A protein has these predicted regions:
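Small-residue-rich hydrophobic transmembrane alpha-helices
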Residues: 38-98, 135-154, 259-323, 354-368, ...
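Alpha-helical transmembrane segments of multipass membrane proteins
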Residues: 23-27, 98, 140-144, 166-171, ...
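Helix-terminus/linker motif at the lipid-water interface of multi-pass membrane proteins
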Residues: 20-39, 108-115, 171-178, 238-269, ...
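Short runs within selected transmembrane alpha-helices of multi-pass transporters and secretion channels
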Residues: 59, 127-146, 157-165, 183-198, ...
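N-terminal transmembrane alpha-helices
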Residues: 1-32, 46-61, 65, 90-97, ...
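Short alpha-helical transmembrane segments in multi-pass integral membrane proteins
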Residues: 1-11, 66-133, 175-228, 285-350, ...
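Transmembrane alpha-helix boundary and packing residues in multipass membrane permease domains
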Residues: 11, 15, 27, 31, ...
Length: 427
């Protein structure tokens, strides 16, 4: 238990802070620009999450293979996965920056940025794209640090970036009145602090950065194979956000979009807490898996389930009690605040199911069960889209809200079936 807490507690705290990190721009912009600014960030944020998810996926893929190979006694091969992951992070940063700058207009249209939302969304997104490298590396190196026993240091670097973001948001958005641009610059400079701190750790701890990468292409494929699941876990809430925004706009207008922005900000912290438990327990699961200790893997996973459920229950209680305060925090209108409070209980009903599927998925990719992890990750957005095409036709806007919960319940059912299949296969 002590070793479990040593890995999980710093990870949970770090992701809790990154959850607040994610809503800081919304807080400052919502209270400065108003509902339209809040909606603009909400609409374009899936692209920002795509960048960060790419870093998370590559970093986690490299970290899992590094830990497993070391546990199997193949140290040099494991070290090569670190070098491969870092080079892949750089390549991904360059490609994402170029693609997003070239296709900015069609991407904005695809995201549904229309009317008064579009110019504000473009202003925010363009600056965030300029900082792609900071975001990809800030999220990509952290899993490597955590798998090297540096969970506490990873937490410190994330706290430093978070603190910088708050200070700069206050300065740029409220004092200098730079609006959307100020919020974007504050975010990427905060990520730059985390990235620099991570490189300091890499240098001080002498992680295997320099040297050759034998079978580079093969290792890239293996990193991607493992990383698709954590990439999807980070991106999935934003895919869901994209779907929800489009259907909220169709059935409830800009008021529903602004309301879901408030709800999504509140739920983001919960989702990231679950990610903190899953990613925090991953190094131990990968280590025991590499050592062939199946019972230890199950023990760590069971502790992760219990921790995630306790956190989910606590968050459900807090969000329920403050459901009519969320809109006020983000400077929303009275209509948006009322709609947010009325809809929040529906979303809270799915959190325990989400916690189960999230930890189950982490266990799958930590033990190289890529197919099962893919199914768990991508089932939720696919099911959500199917439900959004059906349920709102009957229940209108309430059907949009309900579709999210139903998709989480069904995904948890799929995860449970796959978990049972895994147990039978091991036996």
């Amino acid at each position: 238990m002590k070793k479990f807490l040593k890995y999980v507690v710093p990870s949970v705290l770090a992701f809790a802070l990154s959850g607040i990190y994610a809503i800081v721009d919304g807080f400052f912009v919502g209270n400065s620009v108003g509902d339209v600014g809040l909606s603009a960030i909400n609409v374009v944020y899936p692209v920002v999450t795509l960048m960060q998810s790419a870093g998370t996926g590559i970093g986690m893929g490299g970290a899992v293979m590094w830990t497993v190979r070391r546990a199997e006694g193949q140290k040099e091969d494991g070290d090569e996965y670190v070098r491969t992951a870092l080079r892949l992070l750089l390549l991904t940063s360059i490609v994402l920056t170029a693609v997003m700058l070239i296709f900015m207009d069609p991407v904005l249209s695809f995201l549904g940025a229309e009317g008064t939302i579009r110019p504000l969304g473009e202003e925010y997104l363009r600056i965030m794209v300029y900082g792609t490298t900071f975001q990809v590396f800030a999220t990509g190196i952290v899993p490597l640090i955590r798998n090297n026993g540096g969970a506490s240091f990873a937490m410190v670097t994330m706290i430093a970036g978070f603190g910088m973001n708050i200070v700069l948001d206050y300065l740029f958005v409220w004092v200098l009145q730079l609006g959307m641009a100020g919020a974007a610059w504050a975010s990427i400079l905060g990520q730059a602090v985390t990235m620099v701190g991570s490189f300091v750790y890499v240098w001080k701890e002498k992680l295997p950065v320099l040297g050759v990468c034998k079978e580079f292409g093969k290792k890239v494929c293996r990193i991607v194979q493992i990383g698709i699941a954590p990439f999807g876990l980070s991106l999935s809430p934003m895919i869901s956000l994209l779907f929800m925004n489009r259907f909220c706009l169709s059935y409830g207008g800009e008021t529903a979009v602004a309301s879901y922005a408030c709800i999504a900000y509140g739920l983001t912290i919960v989702y990231l807490l679950m990610q903190g438990v899953g990613d925090g327990s991953q190094p131990l699961m990968s280590l025991h898996y590499g050592e062939g200790k199946t019972k230890e893997v199950d023990r760590v996973r069971n502790m992760a389930y219990a921790t995630a459920w306790v956190l989910a229950l606590a968050c459900m209680l807090i969000l329920y009690m403050t459901r009519y305060d969320l809109g006020v925090i983000f400077g929303s209108s009275d209509v948006v605040t009322q709609m947010t409070g009325n809809a929040m209980p529906i979303f809270l009903a799915g959190l325990l199911f989400y916690a189960f599927s999230r930890i189950t998925t982490s266990g799958f990719y930590a033990t190289e069960q890529s197919l099962f992890s893919y199914i768990c990750v991508y089932a939720e957005p696919v099911l959500l889209l199917i439900l959004l095409l059906i349920v709102p036709r009957i229940l209108r806007q309430d059907g949009v809200w309900l579709s999210m919960v139903l998709s989480q319940i069904l995904t948890a059912g799929i995860a449970c079936l796959l978990r049972q299949k895994e147990k039978k296969r091991i036996v």
